[in-house]
């Protein structure tokens, strides 16, 4: 691993329909093999589906879902004197967002609906209402951190 300099962050343009940077990041995370148009169709289709079902602003619902899934604290392994401890640490804001996006997508992929649009819209609605597997994942991570609070003095 090179120690010369840290890779600079790439500039991400907001998405064309809603003008939102987070939706663009979400789209990029869904994209496979550089097929951005397919990812756009999935994300916009899911947001349109959510708008029809809930009759609310889909962007607000999307942000609420992300906020409900984002972890505030997580555990990292730390080796101290031959023993490995799970040390709870706070999550940086950019990592919080990245984890929330990743967990939402993996939870949507694990659902039983037929198309990815249906799966994603269902998971977004569930996450916005504090239900679903993505929220369960966040609660599991928080529970793990709470259980290992005794090792928080090993923080670095």
UniProtKB/Swiss-Prot annotation:
Q: Which GO terms describe its cellular component?
A: small ribosomal subunit
A biological process (GO) of this protein is: translation
One matching Pfam family? Ribosomal_S7
Q: Which InterPro entries match?
A: Ribosomal_uS7, Ribosomal_uS7_bac/org-type, Ribosomal_uS7_CS, Ribosomal_uS7_dom, Ribosomal_uS7_dom_sf
Source domain of life is Bacteria
Q: Check the record and name the Gene3D superfamilies matching this protein.
A: Ribosomal protein S7 domain (1.10.455.10)
State the function annotated in the UniProt record: One of the primary rRNA binding proteins, it binds directly to 16S rRNA where it nucleates assembly of the head domain of the 30S subunit. Is located at the subunit interface close to the decoding center, probably blocks exit of the E-site tRNA.
Please describe the quaternary structure of this protein. Answer: Part of the 30S ribosomal subunit. Contacts proteins S9 and S11.
Q: Which PANTHER family match?
A: RIBOSOMAL PROTEIN S7
Q: Which HAMAP family match?
A: Ribosomal_uS7_B
The entry sums up its family as follows: Belongs to the universal ribosomal protein uS7 family.
Mind telling me what this protein is named?
Small ribosomal subunit protein uS7
Q: Quote the gene name from the UniProt entry.
A: rpsG
